[in-house]
Amino acid sequence: MITIVLLILAYLLGSIPSGLWIGQVFFQINLREHGSGNTGTTNTFRILGKKAGMATFVIDFFKGTLATLLPIIFHLQGVSPLIFGLLAVIGHTFPIFAGFKGGKAVATSAGVIFGFAPIFCLYLAIIFFGALYLGSMISLSSVTASIAAVIGVLLFPLFGFILSNYDSLFITIILALASLIIIRHKDNIARIKNKTENLVPWGLNLTHQDPKK
């Protein structure tokens, strides 16, 4: 019974639409009506500012981490922490508290990985910020980190680097999360190809995007 309760709790944690609620409560702004219409970290930064964007990221990240740690906190046996983390990501993407219309799963997925394999998460953070500096696009960085996650989980155990052994469930979860993130960014990918993707005011913009085009 406790397992079912905690699995439901993991989904509910993921379903907390932090950006949407922060906008409505503190700014009287519905993020769905502004910018990209997304309720995640990037649109929150763009529409509501740095403080709101950072708060959204922290909440979205650590709700994934907390969900992943639930079975450890409650000394639950028999169900991998990754299953709880996956449910949090599903909740974030399809939140019951926001009409099942959620974010793009990046921050919460990162939080899940941090809760299960923190050094692997650090590797992905380096990839993410490296890609962000080179391309000046959150979307490109997210997709790049997703691809790097798949490459890492498949190759690193072979060399005993960061991941000491192959974990079939971890590989499956990484493949699922990476696929979800890439699918959720399909519109962004199209804009990147057309050189019209939104930029952040940092980095080299080596792909020469022109969002005003």
Swiss-Prot record:
GO terms for biological process: phospholipid biosynthetic process. Pathway: Lipid metabolism; phospholipid metabolism. It catalyses: an acyl phosphate + sn-glycerol 3-phosphate = a 1-acyl-sn-glycero-3-phosphate + phosphate. It is a multi-pass membrane protein. Its EC number is 2.3.1.275. It holds the Pfam family G3P_acyltransf. The chain crosses the membrane at residues 2-22, 52-74, 81-100, 112-132, 143-163, 164-184. One of its GO terms (molecular function) is acyl-phosphate glycerol-3-phosphate acyltransferase activity. InterPro entries: G3P_acylTferase_PlsY (IPR003811). GO terms for cellular component: plasma membrane. It is found in: Cell membrane. Keywords: Cell membrane, Lipid biosynthesis, Lipid metabolism, Membrane, Phospholipid biosynthesis, Phospholipid metabolism, Transferase, Transmembrane, Transmembrane helix. Catalyzes the transfer of an acyl group from acyl-phosphate (acyl-PO(4)) to glycerol-3-phosphate (G3P) to form lysophosphatidic acid (LPA). This enzyme utilizes acyl-phosphate as fatty acyl donor, but not acyl-CoA or acyl-ACP. Belongs to the PlsY family. Probably interacts with PlsX. HAMAP family: PlsY (MF_01043). PANTHER family: GLYCEROL-3-PHOSPHATE ACYLTRANSFERASE-RELATED (PTHR30309:SF0), INNER MEMBRANE PROTEIN YGIH (PTHR30309). This is Glycerol-3-phosphate acyltransferase. The lineage of its organism: Bacteria, Bacillati, Bacillota, Bacilli, Lactobacillales.
